C-alpha cells in the first residue's frame, strides 16, 4: 500500500476550501484503492484566529455584526468543525511549530488544490510548499499561486522557485499560475480542474442530504459587498415570487434587506441550499461550479471581470449564464428556461479523465 499525505487549506472555514479538500480525498480513494490517503492536519495559529467566531483583528463594524448574529455564526463554526473532523481523513493535529517530516511515513506528498501557494493569502504558510519534506516524492494537484504571486520581491520569487523545484510533478489550477512559474522554472506543468469537479453529481447529492428548506427559493451566494447582485436578487425575487436565501453575511447590507439569512450554514448545508434551489445567483467560482454540477438554473453577474469564473463558463458552454444586472424581463424569462448541460457534462468527463491520468502517473500507478 502506498501512503499519501496531502497538505491544503482543509481547515479554512470557507466552502470552496473545505469541499475541494474532501473532493480530492474521495477521488483518490475511489480510483486508487491501493493508496492510503491522509490530509495533513496543519492548523496554524493565524488560520485558527482568522476563522474564529470573533476574530481579534476584525473591524468594529464586523464585531458589532457578530454580536447581532452570534448564535448563528457560532453554529456555522460548529458545522465547519464537524465536517472537517468527521468527513476528512486527517492525521493528528500539527501547528506550524511542531510539524516535521519525521512525524510521518508517507511515500508521496501532495500540495493542493486551492490557493495554498498564494503568498498574499491571510493564512499562507511556507509549509504548504512542503518545506518540511526532504526525502519523499512531492507533487501538486490543481494548486494556485494567486494573481500576484510573482510580483513580490525577488527574494520571494527565488524562494518560490527553490521550493517548487523540489517537486517531481506539477499540476496547477490556472493557466496564469503556469505562465508565472514557467518564467522562473524549466519543468513540465499541466493545468487540471479544481478538485470539486472531480466528483460526479450523485456523490455531492448524497453528501447534501435531505432537503432543508421546504418552500421554493432563490439561493444567493456572493463573496463581497456587491450592490448589483443584491439588487438583482431583489428584482428576481419580485419577478418570480420566490424568497431569497443567503448563507454568507456581508455586514454593510445585512441590516437592510428582506432576504432569509442562513448564517449558520456549514459545508453540507451550503450544498443542500444549492441542490434544492429553484435558481442560483452567484458571483463565486465555487457557487457557479456547484450550481452547474447540480444542473440548476445558474445566473452570474459580470463574470468577464473575474478571469477564473469567466474561463469556467466559456470552457463548459455556460457563457450565456453570465448577464448584466440591468437586463429586461424578457431576458430574465429566457434565463429561467431549462439549461442545457450536455456540453458541460461531456467536457467534465474528459477533464476528470485527464486528472486521473495525471495522478496515476504522479503516484507511479501502472
Please state what every model-predicted region is:
Residues 1-366:
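Active-site anion-handling motifs in enzyme catalytic cores
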Amino acid at each position: 500500500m502506498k501512503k499519501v499525505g496531502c497538505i491544503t487549506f482543509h481547515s479554512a472555514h470557507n466552502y470552496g476550501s473545505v469541499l475541494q479538500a474532501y473532493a480530492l480525498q474521495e477521488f483518490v480513494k475511489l480510483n486508487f484503492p491501493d493508496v492510503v490517503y491522509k490530509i495533513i492536519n496543519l492548523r496554524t495559529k493565524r488560520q485558527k484566529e482568522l476563522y474564529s467566531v470573533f476574530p481579534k483583528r476584525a473591524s468594529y463594524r464586523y464585531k458589532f455584526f457578530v454580536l447581532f448574529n452570534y448564535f448563528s455564526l457560532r453554529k456555522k463554526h460548529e458545522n465547519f468543525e464537524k465536517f472537517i473532523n468527521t468527513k476528512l481523513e486527517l492525521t493528528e493535529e500539527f501547528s506550524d511549530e511542531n510539524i516535521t517530516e519525521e512525524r510521518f511515513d508517507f511515500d508521496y506528498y501532495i500540495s493542493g488544490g486551492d490557493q495554498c501557494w498564494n503568498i498574499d493569502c491571510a493564512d499562507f504558510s511556507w509549509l504548504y510548499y512542503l518545506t518540511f519534506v526532504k526525502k519523499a516524492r512531492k507533487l501538486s494537484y490543481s494548486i494556485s499561486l494567486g494573481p500576484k504571486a510573482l510580483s513580490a520581491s525577488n527574494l520571494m520569487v527565488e524562494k518560490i522557485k527553490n521550493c517548487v523545484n523540489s517537486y517531481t510533478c506539477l499540476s496547477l489550477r490556472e493557466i496564469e499560475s503556469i505562465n508565472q512559474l514557467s518564467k522562473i522554472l524549466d519543468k513540465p506543468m499541466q493545468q487540471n480542474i479544481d478538485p470539486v469537479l472531480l466528483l460526479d453529481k450523485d456523490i455531492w447529492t448524497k453528501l447534501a442530504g435531505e432537503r432543508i428548506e421546504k418552500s421554493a427559493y432563490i439561493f444567493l451566494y456572493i463573496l463581497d459587498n456587491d450592490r448589483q447582485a443584491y439588487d438583482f436578487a431583489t428584482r428576481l425575487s419580485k419577478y418570480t415570487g420566490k424568497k431569497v436565501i443567503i448563507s454568507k453575511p456581508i455586514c454593510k447590507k445585512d441590516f437592510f434587506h428582506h432576504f432569509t439569512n442562513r448564517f449558520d450554514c456549514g459545508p453540507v448545508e451550503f450544498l443542500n441550499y444549492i441542490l434544492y434551489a429553484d435558481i442560483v445567483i452567484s458571483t463565486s467560482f465555487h457557487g457557479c461550479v456547484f450550481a452547474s454540477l447540480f444542473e440548476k438554473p445558474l445566473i452570474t453577474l459580470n463574470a468577464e471581470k473575474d478571469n477564473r469564473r469567466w474561463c469556467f463558463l466559456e470552457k463548459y458552454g455556460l457563457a450565456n449564464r453570465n448577464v448584466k444586472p440591468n437586463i429586461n424581463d424578457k431576458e430574465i424569462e429566457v434565463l429561467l428556461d431549462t439549461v442545457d448541460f450536455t456540453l458541460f457534462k461531456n467536457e467534465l468527463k474528459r477533464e476528470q479523465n485527464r486528472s486521473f491520468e495525471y495522478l496515476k502517473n504522479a503516484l507511479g500507478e501502472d
